[in-house]
Amino acid sequence: FISKTTFDIENNSTAFDYDLDLDSSSIKIDNLNYDKPANKKSNLKISGIFDKNKLVVNNLNYSESKNNILIKNLHLNNKYQVNNFDQILVNTLKDNIIINNFNAKKNENKIFVSGNKFEATYFLKKLNKDNKRKTFSKEFSGNIDFKVKEIIINKESLFNFSGLGQIQEGKLHKLTAKANFSDNEILDISITPVSLNKKKLFIFSDRAKLFLEDYKFIKGFSGGKLEYTSNYDNKASKSNLKIYDFKVKNVPILAKILTLASLQGVADLLTGEGIRFNEFDMNFNTVGPKIE
């Protein structure tokens, strides 16, 4: 542990320069799917200045084995929300496999993100959620241009992830993004403003299973295409989920009874291949954390 602290009485601020060993600390960063257990060698070098209203991190360098996070000129408010930054460089591994390798730069109101890999599971789960714990402050705005060679969602890889977006007052206001599972299978995501506070999220995926991990009532799922639409604001959302041409091995008893009305349904059950469905259509509303 090495530290240098300087107090500026006139401006009521404090400058700091720390070199910290974090071996005994456990560290978890959800949005990067990064998890360091205690008693693993790691180091944090950080310098900057703070007062009662803000924290400015001039340089941050975190390292642990082959994991590294570098941040330059990060400005935070007194709620530790991001007001601005110059650069964020991330390289992290999980089970000795690289899952994040990207570089984000901000120049005035333009944000450029490029890299080889990005673990996007957490990002997609939060697309239409306006959490109380906000990453960006109301002062943060900018136009985003991104291109990443590979993204990972629920342990599945997609390629050539690219698009444009816009952040206004700390919230994702617009987004168009595309990626490829293969030459003829795509993922398409968009967020468009509908009114002053309401937005529309649209997702189309040629592989539906990727987005069904959290639906506990659907098990043994295979095949299928997915189309998801959600109109939402910071209080509630109205959503529609459609899935086409898929099979499910474990389904509620009512679905089995209905499927047995067809000869194909009997054949599917006898072979153990699962029950075939042409289309699944579900509407649901959320108010806060509650689904209706």
Model-derived regions: residue spans:
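Membrane-proximal interfacial segments on either side of biological membranes
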Residues: F1-E292
